[in-house]
Structures are given as C-alpha cells and as structure tokens.
UniProtKB/Swiss-Prot annotation:
Its main location: periplasm. In R.leguminosarum (biovar viciae) pseudoazurin is dispensable for nitrogen fixation. The gene is azu. Residues 1-23 form the signal peptide. It comes from Rhizobium leguminosarum bv. viciae. This is Putative pseudoazurin. Residues 28-116 form the Plastocyanin-like domain. The keyword Hydrolase does not apply.
Length: 152
C-alpha cells in the first residue's frame, strides 16, 4: 500500500511540474527611453499563452504598471503596482489587456498584452476615448494582432 501511494504522489508531482514548465515568464521593461521613443514599456506588445506570467521591471525610476480601466477582459480584476516596484502578473484569462504607467499615461506609456488567440475584447480597445499619444501607441500595437487572430 505505501508503494502505491508513493507512486500516486510522485505521478501527481511530475504532472504539476510539467505544467509549470510549460508556462513561460516574460519580461517587460519600464523605460524613460526605448526603441519606440520616450516613456515606454519594452516590448510594448506581447503575445503570450494563457497561464504565462509577465514580470514588469522598473528599469528606470518612477514607473509602475496598472490595468487600463475597461480595457481588459471581463471578469479580470484590476491590478496596480507601486512606483519602482518589480511586479509579476499571471495571465490566465484569454483576451487583450491594455496596461499603463500611471504617472506617464499622458505621454503614451501603455502596453498591449494579447493572451491566447482570438481576443474577444478588441472592439472596446479600438473605440476607447484615450489621450492622443495613447491612441497612437495602441493602434500600432493592435496592428500586430494578425487578421486571422481577430474575432469578427
């Protein structure tokens, strides 16, 4: 009996370990200046799989990451890091997530994370009333979602 129980525990541990190995951790830097200009998340667009995590790294000071109200999938709770805090988020629910740096959103400091294929919540992002610099960056990020991935 103890051998059978031990095999069950070992099998469960192996399955859990394999599942965690499949999930990836992506890194996004929060920068004063990057390849896309001033006040940017780099990369500004990221496509990940459900279950992956993203670590937001305040490479330069005075940055944070926060969900953009109404521009994340339904049922996902909002989150907000403190300034200068490295912050990790696990993305389980498929969809498009618009994130911002609270102090620098007026300068266009936003990021778009696509979780899985066929994000169903693109329309609210496309029509959202946001500052001009935010719209410019969001439109560039939205263009990286290929038409085959867009739900009509």
């Amino acid at each position: 009996m103890p051998l059978k129980f031990g095999l069950i525990v070992a099998t469960a541990a192996l399955i859990a370990s394999a599942a965690s190995l499949m999930a990836a951790d992506h890194q996004v830097q929060m920068l004063n200046k990057g390849t896309d200009g001033a006040m940017v998340f780099e990369p500004g667009f990221l496509k990940i799989a459900p279950g992956d995590t993203v670590t937001f790294i305040p490479t330069d000071k005075s940055h944070n990451v926060e969900t953009f109200k109404g521009l994340i999938p339904d049922g996902v709770p909002d989150f907000k890091s403190k300034p200068n805090e490295q912050y990790q988020v696990k993305f389980d629910i498929p969809g498009a997530y618009v994130l911002k740096c609270t102090p620098h959103v007026g300068m266009g400091m936003v990021a778009l994370i696509q979780v899985g294929d066929n994000p169903a919540n693109l329309e609210p992002i496309k029509i959202a009333k946001v500052p001009n610099m935010v719209r410019k960056r969001l439109d560039a990020d939205l263009a990286q979602i290929t038409p085959a991935q867009i739900t009509q």
